[in-house]
C-alpha cells in the first residue's frame, strides 16, 4: 500500500513532459490512469480501515446487502478524510502541473521512467490484488471432496435441553492471554473453569464479520455471495434459504426460538437471516425500544449491553416457565470496533490507566457477563439449559490491534452444561464446528453440519486440510444455498409493497431478472442509492441473454428510445434478445402468467 502511494506520487512529479505532448488522447489516457489508480488506492485505504483486512468478503457482502442500521458515527471522520484527499488530489493537480517547469521530463528517457513508475504503482496497488482474489474462481484448482459438505438426518433424544447462545461482539479468546492483557477478563477467566472451553477455534474465509460468524456457527457455511454476477442480496426475501441451520433443526423439534440483538435488524440482513431460519421472535433496536428505560440511552449501534443483558435474562426466565423447549440467541454490542462503548453501569470502571477505549469496554462487558452468568449458573434454569458464550468473530481493527497482531489468535467458545465435566479442549477447530458441537449437548446426534464437525466425537476439517481450500472446492454448492425464485408459474406485482411475487416467494423492485439459456432465473440485480444503475447493467448484458426488467417507466423508455411522457409509474420490460424482440407492459398491479412467459421467451 505505502509503496504504491510512493510510486504514484513520484510518477506525478515525472508526468509533466508527457502531458505537454500535443496529443490530447495521450494526455487524457495518462491523466485518467493516474487519477483512477490514485482513487482506487484511497478506496482501498478506506476499506482497510473499516475491515482491518483490505477489501475482503465482509466489504463485498455489505456493499451487496446494504448498510441500513450501520453505526455511521464511527466512520464520519475517515469518510471525510477520504473525500478530502481525493478532492485535493483532483483540484491541485492542474495547478501543480501548470507551474512545474522542469523541462528535462521531456527527454525520452525521463518519459519512459515516469511511465514505468506509473505502471509499477498500478502493479503494487493492493486494490487490484484483493479484487482479483475475490473474483477468481479458485475452486477450479482443487479436487472437489463431496464428503466435505456434511448432511445427515438429525435425531434428538427424549431428554433434550434448552439452548442460550450469547455472541460477545469481537471478544476473542486472545483477550484471555494474561501476558498480553493482564486481568482484562477476570470474570470470564473464572467462568472458563466451569465450562467446556475450546482453545483453538479459527475463523476461516468469509466468517469474520457478525452475520458471517452467525451463518458459520449456526449453518456450518461461510457467507459467500455471487460477487461475479453483481448480485445484491438486499432485495431478496430469504437469507440462505437452502442452508440447513440450527434454527431449522431446532424448529423441527418444536423449539420456540428467539433472537435478541441491540442493533438494527436491517443491518447486514440479520433480521432476514433469523426469520428465514424459523425463529419465532426476532428483535433488534426498534423492537426493543419499549423494553428499555430511556430511549435516548443508546450507542451509535443500538442498545447498551447492561440493558440488553437484563432483557435477555428476563426473557430466559419467561421462556423457562413455559412447558416447551426454547432457544435464545443474543448479540452484545458495546465491544464493537474500533473504540467500543461503555455502559452507564461501568462509567467509573476502567482497565489499566484507562487510555485504551476498546479494552475499557471489554473490561466492562466482562463484569456485566460475570453478573449475568452468576444468576444463570445459580438458577434452576441451568438444570435443563445449555449456555454458550462465544465471539461472533475475531476482533477487527481497533485500539488494541497493535497488541493483537502479534498474538496467536483464536475465537472464544465456552459451553456451560450442568451434566458435562468442565475441561479445556485444545483440538484444532473452526467456526463451522461450533453448531454441530453445541447441538450434541442438547441431545442431538450431530456428527457434522455443512463444513462443520462435532468436535466431541469427530475431527475438524481444519485438522488435516486447509479449510479455505475446502471452502473454494465447495464454493458453487455454497452459492446455490441462496436460491432464486422461479418464474415457471409466472408472477404478480404489488405496486404498494414494491414487490414481485413468485408463488410464496418474492423480491423487491426495481429489479433486473436475468435468465439463463433455459430461461430460468440465473441472476437477480437490484437498485441502490450507491449502485451502478440497472439501465447500465441491462446495457452490459451479453447480446443473447434474455431478461425481465421492472423499473420506473421513464427509465425503461429512455433505455429503449421510446418517446412516451404519459406513464409515470412502473413498467415491465420483457426482452428476448435471441429473437430481437421486446415488450413493455404497465406494471400497475399486473400479473404475468406462465403461458405468456413461455410464449414470449420460448416461442411456445
Indicate where each model-derived feature is located.
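Transmembrane and membrane-interface helices of multi-pass
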Residues: 1-136, 599-604
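Membrane-interface soluble catalytic domains
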Residues: 18, 265-268, 420-604
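Active-site-proximal alpha/beta segments of enzymes that process anionic O-linked groups
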Residues: 51-61, 86, 90-97, 118-151, ...
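Substrate-binding rim/cap in mid-to-C-terminal beta-strand-loop elements of soluble/periplasmic
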Residues: 212-223, 403-446
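Acidic helix/loop microenvironments that form the catalytic cleft of cell-wall polysaccharide enzymes
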Residues: 215-218, 275, 331-338, 388-398, ...
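Feature representing long, continuous alpha-helical segments
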Residues: 248, 310, 314, 363, ...
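Active-site neighborhood of glycoside hydrolase catalytic domains
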Residues: 340-347, 359-382, 410-413
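Metal-dependent active-site segment of extracytoplasmic phospho-/sulfohydrolases and closely related
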Residues: 364-405, 438-442
Amino acid at each position: 500500500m505505502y509503496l504504491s502511494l510512493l510510486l504514484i506520487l513520484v510518477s506525478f512529479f515525472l508526468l509533466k513532459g508527457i502531458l505537454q505532448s500535443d496529443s490530447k488522447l495521450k494526455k487524457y489516457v495518462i491523466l485518467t490512469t493516474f487519477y483512477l489508480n490514485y482513487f482506487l488506492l484511497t478506496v482501498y485505504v478506506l476499506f482497510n480501515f473499516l475491515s482491518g483486512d483490505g477489501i475482503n468478503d465482509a466489504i463485498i457482502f455489505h456493499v451487496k446487502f446494504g448498510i441500513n442500521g450501520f453505526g455511521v458515527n464511527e466512520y464520519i471522520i475517515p469518510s471525510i478524510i477520504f473525500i478530502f484527499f481525493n478532492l485535493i488530489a483532483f483540484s491541485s493537480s492542474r495547478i501543480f502541473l501548470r507551474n512545474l517547469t522542469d523541462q528535462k521530463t521531456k527527454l525520452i528517457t525521463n518519459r519512459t521512467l515516469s511511465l514505468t513508475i506509473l505502471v509499477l504503482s498500478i502493479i503494487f496497488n493492493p486494490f487490484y490484488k484483493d479484487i482479483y482474489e475475490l473474483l477468481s474462481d479458485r475452486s477450479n484448482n482443487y479436487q472437489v471432496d463431496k464428503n466435505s459438505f456434511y448432511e445427515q438426518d438429525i435425531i434428538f433424544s427424549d431428554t433434550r435441553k434448552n439452548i442460550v447462545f450469547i455472541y460477545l461482539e469481537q471478544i476473542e479468546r486472545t483477550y484471555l492471554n494474561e501476558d498480553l492483557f493482564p486481568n482484562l477478563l477476570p470474570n470470564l477467566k473464572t467462568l472458563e473453569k466451569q465450562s467446556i472451553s475450546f482453545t483453538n477455534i479459527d475463523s476461516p474465509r468469509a466468517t469474520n464479520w457478525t452475520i458471517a460468524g452467525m451463518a458459520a456457527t449456526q449453518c456450518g457455511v461461510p457467507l459467500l455471495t455471487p460477487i461475479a454476477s453483481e448480485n445484491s442480496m438486499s432485495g431478496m426475501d430469504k437469507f440462505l434459504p437452502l442452508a440447513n441451520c440450527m434454527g431449522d433443526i431446532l424448529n423441527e423439534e418444536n423449539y420456540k426460538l428467539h433472537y435478541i440483538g441491540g442493533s438494527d435488524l436491517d443491518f447486514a440482513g440479520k433480521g432476514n437471516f433469523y426469520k428465514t431460519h424459523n425463529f419465532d421472535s426476532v428483535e433488534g433496536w426498534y423492537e426493543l425500544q419499549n423494553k428499555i428505560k430511556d430511549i435516548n440511552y443508546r450507542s451509535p449501534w443500538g442498545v447498551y449491553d447492561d440493558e440488553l443483558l437484563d432483557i435477555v435474562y428476563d426473557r430466559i426466565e419467561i421462556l423457562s416457565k413455559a412447558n416447551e423447549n426454547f432457544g435464545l440467541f443474543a448479540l452484545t454490542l458495546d465491544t464493537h470496533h474500533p473504540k467500543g462503548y461503555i455502559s452507564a453501569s461501568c462509567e467509573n470502571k476502567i482497565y489499566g490507566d484507562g487510555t485504551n477505549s476498546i479494552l475499557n469496554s471489554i473490561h466492562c462487558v466482562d463484569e456485566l457477563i460475570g453478573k449475568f452468568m452468576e444468576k444463570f449458573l445459580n438458577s434452576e434454569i441451568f438444570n435443563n439449559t445449555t449456555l454458550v458464550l462465544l465471539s461472533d468473530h475475531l476482533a477487527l481493527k481497533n485500539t488494541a490491534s497493535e497488541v493483537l497482531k502479534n498474538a496467536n489468535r483464536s475465537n472464544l467458545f465456552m459451553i456451560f452444561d450442568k451434566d458435562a465435566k468442565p475441561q479445556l479442549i485444545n483440538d484444532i477447530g473452526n467456526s463451522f464446528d461450533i453448531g454441530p458441537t453445541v447441538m450434541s449437548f442438547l441431545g442431538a446426534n450431530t456428527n457434522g453440519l455443512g463444513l462443520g464437525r462435532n468436535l466431541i466425537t469427530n475431527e475438524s476439517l481444519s485438522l488435516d486440510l486447509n479449510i479455505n481450500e475446502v471452502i473454494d472446492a465447495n464454493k458453487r454448492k455454497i452459492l446455490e444455498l441462496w436460491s432464486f425464485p422461479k418464474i415457471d408459474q409466472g408472477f404478480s406485482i404489488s405496486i404498494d409493497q414494491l414487490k414481485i411475487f413468485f408463488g410464496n416467494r418474492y423480491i423487491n423492485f426495481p429489479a433486473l431478472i436475468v435468465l439463463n439459456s433455459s430461461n430460468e432465473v440465473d441472476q437477480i440485480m437490484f437498485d441502490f442509492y450507491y449502485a451502478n444503475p440497472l439501465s447500465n447493467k441491462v446495457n452490459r448484458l451479453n447480446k443473447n441473454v434474455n431478461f425481465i426488467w421492472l423499473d420506473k417507466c421513464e427509465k425503461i423508455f429512455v433505455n429503449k428510445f421510446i418517446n412516451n411522457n404519459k406513464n409515470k409509474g412502473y413498467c415491465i420490460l420483457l426482452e428476448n434478445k435471441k429473437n430481437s424482440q421486446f415488450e413493455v407492459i404497465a406494471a400497475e398491479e399486473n400479473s404475468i402468467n406462465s403461458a405468456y412467459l413461455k410464449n414470449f421467451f420460448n416461442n411456445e
